[in-house]
């Protein structure tokens, strides 16, 4: 982890807001953390600005999820632009869930077990980058671990024995569903709007599974959500997997399923 410039030795960048939460919890006051993809932007198609490219080149670390669309599209250009910045795939060591056609679900942070792995990867990178602060980072990491463990306990208690299914437009809760034995019924088909036939088939499945909730993200709002909600008598609940407030968002999702 080299120092690009003298004035920027204590800055790092993350790709999305949930990673900023983890990074700030561990890095504390030793690093200033900035996020590349702003709130209410789509990380699948986001294009970094020239100012962000400059900020990245002056950062010591760049924490990525590793599977998000814009990360895959821009990875080579970002690394060429910031040769002295250490790029860290925080999902390293996580068993990915496939969505078909060789594409993995990128929402790895929407699982407490995965969040713990991602935080460990951050701790390792920060310790290598600034060895003199290793004990400081380790203490902060332990506190974050406790928060993650408490969140997991809370979610387990909330969802225990429910065996629920839920509808969702964009399949952002695959890891969440897997962790708590839930079934995710997805409206979107591999990034595309479903056909009338696909929509009807999903409605029939929903009538069998009897989900009570339909999760939606603001950036994916469209008429198919209303059609599905009316046809299946489900309650529409807005979620934000890209929220900085990771523990609160995880609990919000679980409470909606209670």
Residue ranges and their predicted role:
Residues 1-258:
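Extracytoplasmic metal-acquisition and chelation regions
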